[in-house]
Amino acid sequence: MKQTIRLSSGGGWGFWAGWALAFLGFPLGGVAAAALIGPITTPLGGAIGGIITGAIVGAAQWLALRRRLSLTRGWIAATALGMGAGLALGIALLGTSTDGATLPLRGLIAGAGIGSAQFILLRAVGSRAPIWPVVVALGWALGWMLTRAAGVDLTLQWAVFGSSGALTFQLLTGLTLAWMLRGHAVAPGPAAVL
């Protein structure tokens, strides 16, 4: 099925409040992954934990985005699969250390997986959509750095960063969405095949 993204005239404060509240998907997803599979210590664990967490984060984001964009539930699947692949690849390449640059680099890889998968669905939004994977990758790395700086115990090998990182990530991506959508009509034609 082909999907064309259409902008809704609705939005405003309700949309942005929903996008801000979507940060709750991060701690809920992290707790769900921890409860179901425990610490994320292997690429396989990263893939499974990423899919679980990504599905919950993606669902929270989709609930907010569907008010402004005519996205399908494919957003949830894209987020889950992108996070599973990105987290598994990051662990395979860099291990599970939370010290030094390893943590934000692994976050950059996971974020690139998520952002690239979501971009497939956002590409019909307009000419600014290619910035999305870059912002998500950088935001994911920043989220991990802020979580570490806030003193969260990262030895528990969480699948996703904490609330401080999630709030910052949602702010950064929300501002990016506002910039992407401002004054742009959706290009006609197919956006993605799902």
Predicted features and spans:
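Juxtamembrane/disordered regions of integral membrane proteins
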Residues: M1-L194
